[in-house]
Amino acid sequence: MVATSKQTTQGYVVEAYGNLLRVHVDGHVRQGEVAYVSVDNTWLKAEIIEVVGDEVKIQVFEETQGISRGALVTFSGHLLEAELGPGLLQGIFDGLQNRLEILADTSLFLRRGEYVNAICRETVWAYTQKASVGSVLSRGDVLGTVKEGRFDHKIMVPFSCFEEVTITWVISSGNYTVDTVVAKGRTSTGEELEFTMVQKWPIKQAFLEGEKVPSHEIMDVGLRVLDTQIPVLKGGTFCTPGPFGAGKTVLQHHLSKYAAVDIVVLCACGERAGEVVEILQEFPHLKDPHTGQSLMHRTCIICNTSSMPVAARESSIYLGITIAEYYRQMGLHILLLADSTSRWAQALREISGRLEEIPGEEAFPAYLASRIAAFYERGGAVKMKDGSEGSLTICGAVSPAGGNFEEPVTQATLSVVGAFCGLSKARADARRYPSIDPMISWSKYLDSVAEILEKKVPGWGESVKQASRFLEEGAEIGKRIEVVGEEGISMEDMEIFLKSELYDFCYLQQNAFDAEDCYCPFDRQIELFSLMNHIFNSRFCFDCPDNARSFFLELQSKIKTLNGQKFLSEEYQKGLEVIYKLLESKMVQTA
């Protein structure tokens, strides 16, 4: 991707501030347009971010060393776009959609000015023709399909085509590369169009054709604390703020491995390179618990680590959501994981500072909240013209400095998401993983999930509320115990405290390194939760706090052992019987 003869508009550099250049332009340009800056016989990709008269300000996505006043700049005439088509899955891209495995063949380090196609032009795909000559199609309608892994990848009329098209020619089913013309059409104005398997779309514009509908399906992630206390629906939005070391990245890795969705798009925008390397090493060897295939078969990774240019962080998060929206249009369920949106916000702050804009709180731009809201609004469930439904669930990790949830990025995020999974440093230090604090977390989807599960598990919603009440009461009693000791509280309060601790240790906490406990399917969660509710509704007889504590510790040990056993195995059934017998030995009555 370099300047071509079609790029007639040119300019020259007037001034440079880091990766921000002020350029005098001879011709017509528009905000968001892609430009190329000439330096050392290479072309550096850039984007127009401000237009003032005959001058523009552009942010360069590469190291700007060597750029001098008067350097030639050419403008492409098109916006910053994503290349969309078969072959994106299993791909590893940078923020500009360069395939990193191809760049790795040329050099150990990323050389500036090197750009490669996101979709391989040599790969042959088995194309099945669906459209017929004479049919009238519009944007998003299916021309044909190719098999991409286990998915039928729909080749659609480009979304940049806003007119109805009458198909005049179609190719027969067979094996073709992505640049092969698979159909031709004519618009109402007589314009002739050719369609290939690849289309492009500006990454900063929402990619949508169809009707947005309310979310009505639970996204099972295999984490009991999320599925029970802070559930999320497919097409919902949630965030995972937390201080450094609280386990945000590990939580996102778990979601990418076990979430019950079709495709996961992982945006590592600004996180440490070591964490990205860990993903690249682990994922090809991990199995998807839902299909048994490699996790990479359903994953697309955009790597933009903190060591890469700041400007590319912004493009990486928009690139990720554009790819996710593209697959949603095929009727698939997508999960987008952005780690971390704080780094993206810091990139916005840096660019805003160089543009000399009036700063908002903590020097972030005044439009930060609207940018974050616009990003999360691109999620949701969509009903297509053919009646199929797809969804895009967005999870954004937030890294507030010092774990301060009052800072602007966290507050702007909380105002637009449907669920808040707050990670606590205190819980992480106490080794209570996942360190999601149920006392500060919340979900707007609780009632919707309760309504869905009511048919399968009567009283689910009330049971979850009861568990939350026990947690709140237990936390209050725990604070009193720290002040007056166990002797200063009643036996009834002691029992409530121990029940809340048991629920925390045995239900909310999970061992990510245990083969069984790392992923808890919904049927298993329902059975364990019914056991917890049986304990909540039971009264026990104890002589003193020590006896009560020893009983609940024994109970905790047996339930922890049960969590590590294969579900419905002989050992599991025996362990469950032992637990119920132990409960009966101390039980006074059931409420």
Swiss-Prot record:
Catalytic reaction annotation: ATP + H2O + 4 H(+)(in) = ADP + phosphate + 5 H(+)(out)
Keyword annotations of the record: ATP synthesis, ATP-binding, Hydrogen ion transport, Ion transport, Nucleotide-binding, Translocase, Transport
Ligand binding (ATP): G242, P243, F244, G245, A246, G247, K248, T249
Pfam families with a match to the protein in the record: ATP-synt_ab (PF00006), ATP-synt_ab_N (PF02874), ATP-synt_ab_Xtn (PF16886), ATP-synt_VA_C (PF22919)
Biological processes annotated in GO: proton motive force-driven plasma membrane ATP synthesis
InterPro entries: ATP-synt_VA_C (IPR055190), ATP-synth_a_Xtn (IPR031686), ATPase_a/bsu_AS (IPR020003), ATPase_F1/V1/A1_a/bsu_N (IPR004100), ATPase_F1/V1/A1_a/bsu_nucl-bd (IPR000194), ATPase_F1/V1_b/a_C (IPR024034), P-loop_NTPase (IPR027417), V-ATPase_asu (IPR022878)
EC number, as in UniProt: 7.1.2.2
GO MF annotation terms: ATP binding; proton-transporting ATP synthase activity, rotational mechanism; proton-transporting ATPase activity, rotational mechanism
Highest taxon of the lineage: Bacteria
Cited PANTHER family: H(+)-TRANSPORTING TWO-SECTOR ATPASE, V-TYPE PROTON ATPASE CATALYTIC SUBUNIT A
Biological role: Produces ATP from ADP in the presence of a proton gradient across the membrane. The V-type alpha chain is a catalytic subunit.
Similarity comment text for this entry: Belongs to the ATPase alpha/beta chains family.
Protein name, UniProt field: V-type ATP synthase alpha chain
Gene that encodes it: atpA
